[in-house]
Amino acid sequence: MNALLSNPFKEGLRKGDTQIGLWLSSTTSYMAEIAATSGYDWLLIDGEHAPNTVQDLYHQLQAIAPYASQPVIRPIEGSKALIKQVLDIGAQTLLIPMVDTAEQARQVVSATRYPPLGQRGVGASVARAARWGRIDNYMAQANESLCLLVQVESKVALENLDAILEVEGIDGVFIGPADLSASLGYPDNAGHPEVQRIIEACIYRIRAAGKAAGFLAVDPAMAQKCLAWGANFVAVGVDTMLYTEALDSRLAMFKSVQSVSTAKRSY
């Protein structure tokens, strides 16, 4: 099978395109496919805070595959063993949470690359990623098409941001607003002026270093701010939150209920 691997999401980042995404926390392939038909540039399948197994992630990758939306998987953490599994099921773009140091970033880069560039285990003949051994020269293609994003979401990570940005193999840095605001002493308040100032400065530093800058904003006004500041891959909602808002809004048409505004909620 003489197929060439491609990663449109990574190519978009290279070109500087702005890519609008959606967070998938519902854990179902059915909801993932519905989202894929909406036209978002990318869909984040969340394995950190949503109760997804590796097989759940696999089924959602399958559901998204026929459509133009590009899947991004966030595993629960950046261990070498888990990264190997997620790559083998066909993920080409990963978002690794809680990366605090350049050394952590280098370890993640190594876990995602086949030797001699890294330490990813070899098992292409039994992996969906290689179409069970049918993609010629898969290992070299996989190293090239992989897109690796890391999350900066703590005071320690902020202190080490410049060093993280220097790590070869990191394609983009994502600012985690909920954990970051808590780490800075403003829990559940990513809208605090000091947090906002830091987010804007981080986005500028990331882009100045030649990397892509990402963000999740459940408030549309905050999403627009981040885009104006230079973030070029921004998730503008979470499927489960949008679902609860729609349910509450519909019920409010017929019963007296209190609905929670998106602008007052954080992820």
From Swiss-Prot:
Note the site residues: Transition state stabilizer.
74
* Residues given in the record as substrate binding sites: 151, 178-179
Organism domain of life: Bacteria
Q: What is its EC number?
A: 4.1.2.53
Q: Cite the binding residues for Mg(2+).
A: 153, 179
Pfam families in the record, alphabetically?
HpcH_HpaI (PF03328)
Does the keyword field hold Lyase?
yes
Q: Does the keyword Methyltransferase apply?
A: no
Catalytic residues as annotated in Swiss-Prot or TrEMBL? 49
Keywords, A to Z, come to: Lyase, Magnesium, Metal-binding
Q: Which InterPro entries match?
A: Aldolase/citrate-lyase_domain, HpcH-HpaI_aldolase, KDR_aldolase, Pyrv/PenolPyrv_kinase-like_dom, Pyrv_kinase-like_dom_sf
Which HAMAP family does the UniProt entry name for this protein? KDR_aldolase (MF_01290)
Entry protein name: 2-keto-3-deoxy-L-rhamnonate aldolase
Q: Which organism is it from?
A: Salmonella typhimurium (strain LT2 / SGSC1412 / ATCC 700720)
Q: What is the lineage of its organism?
A: Bacteria, Pseudomonadati, Pseudomonadota, Gammaproteobacteria, Enterobacterales
